[in-house]
Regions:
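Histidine-acidic metal/acid-base catalytic patches
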Residues: 1-124
Length: 124
């Protein structure tokens, strides 16, 4: 539980929720009024793996060999739902791209995708 104080906020990272075996949308709904910044990245399951396999792997999700890092918007995170909730809540803080594990081209693709999300949910 987050202490009720203006000095405690949340750095929302949907991929960390996936890594922990949690639902990123449920987490966001629980902390939405406290989000002060967000990391944007995405995780993928290796071919043939399921979320249940991830939850059972090595006793916990963690940084399992069943997860890969890749282009934001193409993995397990539901970014339209995330941006819809953030926009509806009036969030206007930082969105930091946490990417580049597989080279600059993937970083560019992530940036393009996130720009589209911002344009869609935060029209000028």
């Amino acid at each position: 539980r987050i202490p009720e104080s203006k000095f405690f906020g949340v750095q929302y990272d949907p991929s960390n929720a996936v890594v922990a075996g949690d639902d990123p949308i449920e987490l966001l709904d629980a902390v939405l009024g406290r989000v002060v910044s967000m990391h944007a990245s995405d995780r993928y399951l290796v071919p043939g793996a399921t979320l249940e396999d991830l939850r059972q792997a090595e006793g916990s999700a963690g940084y399992s060999k069943l997860l890969l890092h890749g282009v934001t918007g193409r993995g397990l995170n539901n970014y339209p739902a995330i941006f819809e909730r953030l926009s509806r809540a009036g969030y206007c803080g930082w969105i930091s791209i946490e990417d580049g594990m597989n080279g600059m081209q993937e970083m560019r693709e992530s940036l393009l995708y996130l720009g589209q999300m911002v344009d869609r949910y935060y029209p000028a």
